[in-house]
């Protein structure tokens, strides 16, 4: 009861308004020593006896309140997690002691039918806690700053900078002696802060996306209404509705249900599922509903569940490196080693030339502090060359591009769960998609019905009268009983009193059809008792219910795929409601009706019944023969707007769309033709036929398969496995059911449906399509291609900078004995190249041209011949320009005077930076001449370019003391900008040069252009 005591003390204890009695007695004694007159004395002190009496009355009142609250809230109290332990420890004895599940329900003030009162939520959360797990605190911004400081090359540079400051102060005094070192320190600080800000913003973005992943909703009964709430709002006492594919959101006890099978492998590690019943009612959070449905009462939430304790111990390990990041890390390592060699050679050349000059002038035995400063600066330059050469911006660019794409896709209703999925989707060559809800709207209505050998089109106003005119009341009664008893949908009342049907789209359509007929509220239906329920799943393709009739007999109702149910029937209901034998001619007519419905793109479902003996085994499965056919439903599910254009886009992008559905083959073919998936050369096949093929037959068949109907989840898995294994395809697969999990896991990219998908399917997927729309899947592919191409653009840009910076400093060191680009200047270039360059180029949005080329195949080179052509061409131009300025600048520009060398070095630095600025613009298009297309709409790119130019002006004109530059006149500025802008002309010339034959040469940007393709995309 300690927790209740704390709760009552916190909320209902009445603190004394005046000081404590002991303090008042001390005050009385003090007053007594000063005020001798007793009458006057007691004006200054209270009557303690009366006060004690008043306090006694207050205590008495409080005790009464406590007793009342104990009595009132005793129904909500269990000592020391006792309620949670009953479920987590599977304590049957304790459960029995409390009166079973019914007793627990009463003790937590809940009702199986009405649930809890919403007004109790705060009280329940205060006592039992909230349904959230303890999460590790997010990393602060300063932790990212610390991480950025851990770069070894920056640490070495910092040491060099401090040495430079120390030696400079000793030789040149304050403040001139510290300029060089302080310039390096400020540059390091700037690099660290920009890196930290970038990483911190990305972490916030990924955390936001992670929070989106955790948004899970569940159906509960509260205040007598069934409603949908977030799992985080669950409290003890809630009545939760579970169905196939759900992840159990809290610990609870089974109330009632049908064939509930729970997968506890996530907690126990046991692969065998557990049957849950009233004899074994314990259901644990984190487990998954493998089959069946049920209602449970919540007994523990959040950190009081075993799942909560387990989740709180798991640290966020972050994302694994994506395949592209791994590949680029290899590239970065090679470039870094080359940079290290150049840095060592540059330092050795500078040192040797310095020693030779010193030996020839003052001798090697005389050393001054200025000599030490020179060597320190040489070493700093060498280390900075390593900083520039090591392209740590490559993995950063990938992460930045993926994060940007993920954010945009989130706005487009696609939640990317794994980073690698986004880039992999850009290489997808096949999309295996479901039909229902993905290609179609998933808003279903009964459009036609066949009953007693009569087909009728359904209209809400006339169908009741039309059916009454062609069938007897007994036939109609059987139809309605089959609809209302054999359904997983439910009619609920909203707050405004209106009725709403909850359930899957198919179940809703049939139940709404039944509600539109007369006789809905007949007492006969409510008098029936459900004995056994077999929920629908994608393997059986049917659902069944066994009911006990008021007459004492029992009856099975079965509903499902038309061909399967028809095979189970040997009788049919005639117009008078009698069961008559089903002749072969009638069976053929029924099949023709099914095919006719399917050819109109209608989903077909059959409803049948079977009378059974009263002594049937309740645990036996539903029979597979001897049924009597009642009706066939033709359900309309229109194709989504935009799907046909999306499929056309896929074709022009070299992506094959294959429909894999459990529907009738004629329905599937009709929808596939309407969407543009099924072509004249395409193959439509049924799952059983596909599964019977040999590997050799599959090898010939699979490339042409465009539609697979009546397929099982295993058939989808087999198709995906063979596409990846036999044809080395990058395959993406959509799925919504629990049984789709193996195919989603096997595919390169698993796409789960956010609306129709189960939690099991979502957990197995890489991307969750929040609106279940096929067009959204194409957007994922577009952004995947954009990520790949954007990284190629950045690599092209960065390698150009690397080559020029390394060569120009090395050649200058060899010939002149000095490096024109100082450590501070190289650090600024490094920031332009790594962080700002990645930000500018990695965030380019996709364009339509990307979807007019086939995808990159596995094993293709990341750096294409087109990229090498651009890199080498731009590098040669920049080396020529900078070399001309270095060796002939003074004479060519007629620069004379004591500061001529400083002006030339500043001009070299300024021209070098502007070459990178214009080459960054050049890199927006690797093959197209027009590099300005769409640049106005990309504000990030414009902002980066503007910031680079603005800061370059500040460095040259105002920070010369730190950056070793001098102010330039307007002619020199014009020259620098002009030399940089010529990079655009060089880019145009380079793009006119063919790059040779071969596979790569025919694949600009890594993609092979299609010979033909629609232009209106």
UniProtKB/Swiss-Prot annotation:
User: Keyword annotations for this protein?
Assistant: ATP-binding, Calcium, Calcium transport, Calmodulin-binding, Ion transport, Magnesium, Membrane, Metal-binding, Nucleotide-binding, Phosphoprotein, Translocase, Transmembrane, Transmembrane helix, Transport
Instruction: Work out whether the entry's keyword set contains ATP-binding.
Output: yes
> In the record, what terms sit under GO molecular function?
ATP binding; ATP hydrolysis activity; calmodulin binding; metal ion binding; P-type calcium transporter activity
- Record's bilayer topology term: Multi-pass membrane protein
Keyword ATP-binding listed? The answer is yes
Where do the catalytic residues lie? 434 (4-aspartylphosphate intermediate)
Q: Which residues bind Mg(2+)?
A: 736, 740
The EC number on file is: 7.2.2.10
**Which top EC class applies here?**
translocase
Its transmembrane ranges are: 154-174, 177-197, 229-249, 331-351, 385-405, 803-823, 826-846, 875-895, 939-959, 973-993
Major subcellular site: membrane
Q: Which domain of life is it from?
A: Eukaryota
CDD domains the UniProt entry points to: P-type_ATPase_Ca_PMCA-like
Reaction catalyzed: Ca(2+)(in) + ATP + H2O = Ca(2+)(out) + ADP + phosphate + H(+)
Q: Which family does it belong to?
A: Belongs to the cation transport ATPase (P-type) (TC 3.A.3) family. Type IIB subfamily.
Task: Tell me the NCBIfam families matching this sequence.
Answer: ATPase-IIB_Ca, ATPase_P-type
Domain notes for this protein = The N-terminus contains an autoinhibitory calmodulin-binding domain, which binds calmodulin in a calcium-dependent fashion.
Physiological role: This magnesium-dependent enzyme catalyzes the hydrolysis of ATP coupled with the translocation of calcium from the cytosol out of the cell, into the endoplasmic reticulum, or into organelles.
| Name of the protein | Probable calcium-transporting ATPase 8, plasma membrane-type
Organism equals Oryza sativa subsp. japonica
């Amino acid at each position: 009861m300690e927790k209740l005591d704390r709760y009552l003390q916190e909320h209902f204890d009445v603190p004394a308004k005046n000081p404590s009695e002991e303090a008042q007695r001390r005050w009385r004694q003090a007053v007594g020593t000063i005020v001798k007159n007793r009458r006057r004395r007691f004006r200054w002190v209270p009557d303690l006896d009366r006060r004690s009496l008043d306090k006694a009355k207050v205590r008495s009142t409080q005790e009464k309140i406590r007793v009342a609250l104990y009595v009132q809230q005793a129904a909500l109290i269990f000592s020391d997690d006792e309620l949670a332990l009953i479920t987590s420890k599977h304590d049957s004895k304790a459960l029995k002691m409390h009166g079973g599940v019914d007793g627990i329900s009463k003790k937590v003030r809940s009702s199986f039918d009405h649930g809890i009162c919403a007004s109790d939520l705060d009280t329940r959360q205060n006592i039992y806690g909230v349904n959230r797990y303890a999460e590790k605190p997010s990393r602060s911004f300063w932790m990212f700053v610390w991480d950025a400081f851990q770069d070894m090359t920056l640490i070495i540079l910092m040491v060099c900078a401090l040495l430079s400051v120390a030696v400079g102060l000793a030789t040149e005094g304050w403040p001139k002696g510290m300029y060089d070192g302080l310039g390096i320190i400020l540059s390091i600080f700037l690099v660290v802060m920009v890196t930290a800000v970038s990483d911190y913003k990305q972490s916030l973005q990924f955390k936001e996306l992670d929070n989106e992943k955790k948004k899970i909703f569940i159906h509960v009964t509260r205040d007598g209404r069934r409603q949908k709430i977030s799992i985080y709002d669950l409290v003890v006492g809630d009545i939760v509705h579970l169905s196939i594919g759900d992840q159990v959101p809290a610990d609870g006890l089974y109330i009632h249900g049908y064939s509930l099978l729970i997968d506890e492998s996530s907690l126990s590690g046991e692969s065998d599922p557990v049957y849950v019943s009233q004899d074994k009612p314990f259901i644990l959070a984190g487990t998954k509903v493998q089959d069946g449905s049920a209602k449970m009462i919540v007994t523990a939430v959040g950190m009081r569940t075993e799942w909560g304790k387990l989740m709180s111990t798991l640290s966020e390990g972050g994302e694994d490196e994506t395949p592209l990041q791994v590949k680029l890390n290899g590239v970065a390592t090679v470039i870094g080693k080359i940079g290290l060699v150049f840095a060592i050679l540059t330092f050795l050349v500078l040192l040797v030339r310095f020693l030779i000059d010193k030996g020839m002038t003052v001798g090697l035995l005389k050393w001054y502090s200025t000599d030490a400063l020179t060597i320190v600066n040489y070493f700093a330059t060498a280390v900075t060359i390593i900083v520039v050469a090591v392209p740590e911006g490559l993995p950063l660019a990938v992460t930045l591009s993926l994060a940007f794409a993920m954010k945009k896709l989130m706005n487009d209703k696609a939640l990317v769960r794994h980073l690698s999925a986004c880039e992999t989707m850009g290489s997808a060559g096949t999309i295996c998609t479901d039909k229902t809800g993905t290609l179609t709207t998933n808003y279903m209505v009964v459009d036609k019905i066949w009953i007693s050998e009569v087909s009728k089109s359904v209209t809400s106003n006339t169908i009741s009268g039309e059916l009454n005119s062609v069938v007897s009341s007994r036939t109609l009664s059987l139809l309605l009983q089959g609809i209302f008893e054999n359904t997983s949908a439910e009619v609920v009342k909203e707050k405004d009193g209106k009725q709403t049907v909850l359930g899957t789209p198919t179940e809703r359509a049939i139940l709404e059809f039944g509600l539109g007929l007369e006789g809905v509220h007949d007492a006969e239906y409510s008098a029936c008792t459900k004995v056994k329920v077999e929920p629908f799943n994608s393997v059986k393709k049917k659902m069944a219910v066994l009911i006990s009739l008021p007459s004492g007999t029992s009856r099975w109702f079965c509903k499902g795929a038309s061909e399967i149910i028809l095979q189970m029937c040997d009788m049919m209901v005639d117009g008078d409601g009698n069961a008559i034998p089903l002749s072969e001619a009638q069976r053929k007519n029924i099949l023709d009706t099914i095919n006719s419905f399917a050819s109109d793109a209608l989903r077909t479902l059959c409803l049948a019944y079977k009378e059974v003996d009263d002594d049937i085994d309740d645990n036996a499965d539903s029979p597979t023969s001897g049924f009597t056919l009642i009706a066939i439903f033709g359900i309309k599910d229109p194709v989504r707007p935009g799907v046909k254009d999306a499929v056309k886009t896929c074709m022009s992008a070299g992506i094959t769309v294959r429909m894999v559905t459990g529907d009738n083959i004629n329905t599937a073919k009709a929808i596939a033709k309407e969407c543009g998936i099924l072509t004249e050369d395409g193959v439509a096949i049924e799952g059983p036929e596909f599964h019977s093929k040999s590997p050799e037959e599959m090898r010939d068949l699979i490339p042409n398969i465009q539609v697979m109907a009546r397929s099982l989840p295993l058939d989808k898995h087999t198709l995906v496995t063979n596409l990846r294994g036999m044809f080395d395809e990058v395959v993406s697969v959509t799925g919504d059911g629990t049984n789709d999990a193996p195919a989603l896991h096997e595919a390169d990219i698993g796409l789960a449906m956010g609306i129709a998908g189960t939690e099991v399917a979502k957990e197995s997927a890489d991307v969750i399509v929040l609106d279940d729309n096929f067009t959204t899947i194409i957007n994922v592919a577009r952004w995947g291609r954009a990520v790949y191409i954007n990284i190629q653009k950045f690599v092209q840009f960065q390698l150009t900078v690397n080559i020029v910076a390394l060569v120009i400093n090395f050649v200058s060191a060899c010939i002149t004995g000095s490096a024109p680009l100082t450590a501070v200047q190289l650090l600024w270039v490094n920031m332009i190249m790594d962080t700002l360059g990645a930000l500018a180029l990695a965030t380019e949005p996709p364009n339509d041209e990307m979807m007019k080329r086939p995808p990159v195949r596995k094993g293709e080179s990341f750096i294409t011949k087109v990229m090498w052509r651009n890199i080498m061409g731009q590098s040669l131009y920049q080396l020529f320009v900078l070399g001309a300025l270095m060796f002939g600048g003074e004479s060519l520009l007629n620069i004379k005077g004591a500061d001529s060398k400083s002006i030339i070095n500043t001009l070299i630095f300024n021209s070098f930076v502007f070459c990178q600025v214009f080459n960054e613009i050049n890199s927006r298009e690797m093959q197209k001449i027009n590099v300005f297309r769409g640049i106005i709409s990309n504000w990030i790119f414009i902002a980066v370019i503007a910031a680079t130019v603005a800061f370059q002006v500040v460095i040259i004109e105002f920070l010369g003391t730190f950056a070793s530059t001098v102010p330039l006149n307007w002619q020199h500025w014009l020259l620098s900008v002009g030399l940089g802008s010529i990079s655009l002309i060089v880019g145009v010339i380079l793009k006119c040069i063919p790059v040779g034959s071969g596979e790569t040469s025919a694949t600009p940007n890594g993609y092979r252009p299609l010979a033909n393709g629609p232009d209106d995309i």
